[in-house]
Amino acid sequence: MMRIIQGDLSDPRVAGLLHIHLSTARAQTAPGSAHALDVSGLQSPDISFWTIWNDEALLGFGALKRLSKEHGEVKSMHVAQSMRRKGTGRAILHHIIATARANGMSRLSLETGSWEYFLPARALYRSHGFTECPPFADYVPDPNSVFMSLDLHRRAP
């Protein structure tokens, strides 16, 4: 049974999957267009980071960055390769959306890659009501990025 808990960045299993996440993001994105957070970025006080487990097996992780009182950003969504297309990403995204709503946010945005590798991620986000939007926060237009946003006042996915 899957369980979502606050992420422990000192856990070697988490560090290992984070290394895979960062390496993959850099390999699948044009230079200068990867916006994945490293350990120090995930330790920022405006970031909440969660891991998802099945018993002692780490399945993935995700984070929520508070941009303002009403606006949050989905960050660092990653699911272990062997656990993709099994509901893991959906579970962590549901958790992030529910947490944003519970914290009074009205909008949730994200940046993901525009390359084919990121098609499944974009499909997951669309299935939860995210739609493409202009760059937000400190992002600038980038052909290697797709920006998406969700109105949290809409019905829960």
Which positions does each model-derived feature cover?
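Acetyl-CoA-dependent GNAT
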Residues: M2-H71, K75, A80, L93-H94, ...
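Generic structural signal for conserved hydrophobic packing positions in ordered secondary structure
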Residues: L18, V74, L108-L110, F118, ...
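Short hydrophobic/aromatic beta-strand or adjacent loop that forms the aromatic wall/cage
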Residues: I47, P143-F147
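Conserved acetyl-CoA-binding loop-helix of GNAT-fold acetyltransferases
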Residues: V79, R85-A98, A123-S127
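Conserved GNAT acetyl-CoA-binding A-motif
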Residues: A100-G113
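Conserved beta-strand-loop-alpha-helix junction that forms the acyl-donor binding cleft
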Residues: L110-A121, Y139-P143
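Short low-complexity, flexible loop/linker segments enriched in glycine and/or proline
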Residues: L124-Y125, M148-L150
